[in-house]
Amino acid sequence: MEKIIALFVFLISLVSSNAVELRFYPYELKLRHAFNLASMSRTSTPGVQVEITIDSITGYGEASMPPYLGESVKSVTEFLSLIDPSRLSDPFALEDIHAYMDSLATGNRAAKAAIDIALHDLTGKIMGRAWYQIYGLDPALAPCTSYTVSVDSPDELSRKLAEAEPYRIIKVKMGVPGDRELIETIRRHTDRPICVDVNQGWKSPEEALDNIMWLATRNVLFVEQPLSKSDFEGHAWLRERSPLPIIADEAVQTSADIPALARCYDGINIKLMKSGGMHEAYKMAVLARALGMKVMIGCMTETSCAVSAAAQLAPLADWVDLDGNLLIANDLFDGMKIVDGKVTLPSTPGIGIEKR
């Protein structure tokens, strides 16, 4: 242990004396198929790529900005422009760096996540370890990922289900007209388990319960964010009556949100773009477990950079939804793989990625 501590101190002193290069640039993610949600449809997602270099070692990070987060390429790049690179000179001081970023502006979690991910990638490379190894996690415990299928025409749906064949769990977006027909169509193709994401699409607890009772007979694992994120009482009422677990998504962003949700939900969906990065996401998983809640690790539509960063936490999760990189046509990185439907973590130092 003393040797490990001595090495850690040496590494900190080594990197803290070097100049820091911070680079960032917009990068639009092109979707392979239109992505249909309860409230919108889109064919691309804006993103910003981040690179932090110290002593010729580069860490990569990413900000993905789906519209509901309220961030944009403009807001992310403006925030990143505020950062003094010298404040990143000790990349191991994550708590201090997050405090510094919070002092620059509140919110901006996707922008902060990009810095956080790049710092994790950088420090892992300096230590020569993947972050799941640094966390002390067993990669064999990483669950199978779900694969998202959205509302579409019957022909298009058949094509998407064919693409989803290698995956053991299907994720379905509900809360839009025709969503029950979508489930029935899927059931005519496959009996694989389904997890349902409503994206706040049901309007009342009674409507939600009616749908959940129907879903409970169709091999559904859980229901994600059935009601408005602000409807705490509605979710508490629903949780008492639901035969399926109720998982918070839009209602939870950081660990500060979790205690109030413990009576309303059975679990939480942790996403790096909501939490501000891996540092906070790890805290969230630990706190949720302490409160007896289920843990899901999810993602936005992202390259393999952010998805592989989230995957470092996968062994902590009951479920993972890490297919964001599979949904885009212009990935910049190679990273974690899905083998027989299961998240497989490479031992590549950092967050497990290599730039193409």
Where would I find each of the regions flagged by the language model?
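Sec-dependent signal peptide recognition
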Residues: 2-7
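Boundary at the C-terminal end of the N-terminal hydrophobic targeting segment
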Residues: 17-19
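Flexible C-terminal active-site loop/helix
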Residues: 22-30, 41, 47, 55, ...
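Metal- or metallocofactor-binding catalytic centers and their adjacent structured scaffolds
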Residues: 24, 53, 58-126
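Conserved, mostly hydrophobic/aromatic
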Residues: 50, 56, 115, 128, ...
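Short, basic, helix/turn surface patches
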Residues: 85-90, 201-202, 225-226, 250-256, ...
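Metal-dependent enolase-superfamily TIM-barrel catalytic cores that perform enediolate-based chemistry
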Residues: 131-242
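Catalytic alpha/beta core domains of metabolic enzymes, predominantly
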Residues: 230-235, 239-322
